[in-house]
Swiss-Prot record:
Name assigned to this protein: Putative nickel-responsive regulator
Database matches in Pfam families: NikR_C (PF08753), RHH_1 (PF01402)
Keyword field: DNA-binding, Metal-binding, Nickel, Transcription, Transcription regulation
Stated family: Belongs to the transcriptional regulatory CopG/NikR family.
Amino acid sequence: MQRITITLDEELLDVIDRRVASQGYQGRSEAIRDLLRAGMRESEALPDDAACVAVVSYLYDHSTRELPRRLNQTLHAHHDLTRSTLHVHLDAGHCLEVSVLQGESGRIGELSRQLMVERGVEHGQVQVMPAPGQAKVR
C-alpha cells in the first residue's frame, strides 16, 4: 500500500469520523478506501456507449465567484443530454439544482463530473439507470 496526503475541510472530516465510529472501522483509511471503491463501482456500472437516463443533483454556494455562470455554461455545452433542470433557492446563499439527463453513459458521467468538481459545489450525486429497453446495470 502507498501512503498519500489529502486536504479536507473540517465538516467533511467530521462526516468521515462519524462514519468511522458508526460503521465500526478501525480508522479513517479503510472508511475512505470503501468510499472510493463505492464511487468507482458506481462510475463503472454501464459501458460508456450504453444508452441511459440519469438524475444529477448538486448543492452549491451561489456566491462563489462566477460559479452559477460556469455551471450554466457547462449545461448549455451539453444541451443535447439535458431533458429538464430544476433550480431551487434553499437559503440566502445556497442553491440546489436537479437535472434529468438522457444519452450515452460516458457522456453523462463526464458532464456530471464537470458539474460536481467545480469549486463551490458542496455536495453532488448522480443516479444512472439504463434507458428503457436496455440491459440492467450490473
